[in-house]
Swiss-Prot record:
Main enzyme class: transferase
Subcellular location: Cytoplasm
Gene field: mnmA
Highest taxon in the source lineage: Bacteria
Organism of this sequence: Chlamydia pneumoniae
Family designation: Belongs to the MnmA/TRMU family.
GO biological process entries: tRNA wobble position uridine thiolation
Annotated protein name in UniProt: tRNA-specific 2-thiouridylase MnmA
UniProt-listed Enzyme Commission number(s): 2.8.1.13
Amino acid sequence: MQQTVIVAMSGGVDSSVVAYLFKKFTNYKVIGLFMKNWEEDSEGGLCSSTKDYEDVERVCLQLDIPYYTVSFAKEYRERVFARFLKEYSLGYTPNPDILCNREIKFDLLQKKVQELGGDYLATGHYCRLNTELQETQLLRGCDPQKDQSYFLSGTPKSALHNVLFPLGEMNKTEVRAIAAQAALPTAEKKDSTGICFIGKRPFKEFLEKFLPNKTGNVIDWDTKEIVGQHQGAHYYTIGQRRGLDLGGSEKPCYVVGKNIEENSIYIVRGEDHPQLYLRELTARELNWFTPPKSGCHCSAKVRYRSPDEACTIDYSSGDEVKVRFSQPVKAVTPGQTIAFYQGDTCLGSGVIDVPMIPSEG
């Protein structure tokens, strides 16, 4: 009996190539599914969903495959955007892409795949799955510049049992070449960057529509002197340099702490200031593909583009771990996701929980 693969299509070149590969080289019945998570200009947000859907339509018509659209705009606002705003209001810096994968793409979209009679869900993520073992393992994509396992690290492994990542073994150059050879309408379309609902506008400009400006003090961590004013502590993230508007300093200034209750931010001068670095952190909201034992030696990424950092994981409680790095790590940001690896295998992830105000040590 012919099986059905449903391709999550975004209107970009990656998912277009996924649909093409399944249609051209497999016996699967292929269906395209476009997911709309944000209403145009909804609540001040911008999104290119209309143009993206038109591109999905063009690709599917060329490939002669059926296609559908589903709107999760309401659920996205409730399960991703609302949390995004709440975390920012509390001083954290969440990653909405990781939230979207967990709450929408590999939950609600999975259910839609089942409704449509799909056997598999295929996406254009640059990562791999090892299904040969008893437990599904998430692996890095073979292209280190495009590896997206970090963004999948917060997704429950139970949600990946029927997922296919055909681009995991490829690099972007190969994908572009396939798209060009197949004359896909999206072959030369630029990759999307940034957060969907923010669009091309400055991040602060978007955020202040929901978290109003509130003037507060900028405090020099070393001297404890007030050196300037800011428009809201929640707009700033640990390690941030841009947007401080502090003149008269020979060295660059960086945010090292925030006091949300007092609406103050703390800065240090110089990119190598010791307060910018941490040797350990706590991670909460753990999600494991391959649960490590306490004392496990592995590596970790504290943000998407950060290098792997050697570390040790120790369980401090059932839902938290203590992470100790071999070398001090710069600009560790509360609210961001830390993903753990052993070689190419992603062990899982947690949410970084470090003090908003650094210690005096």
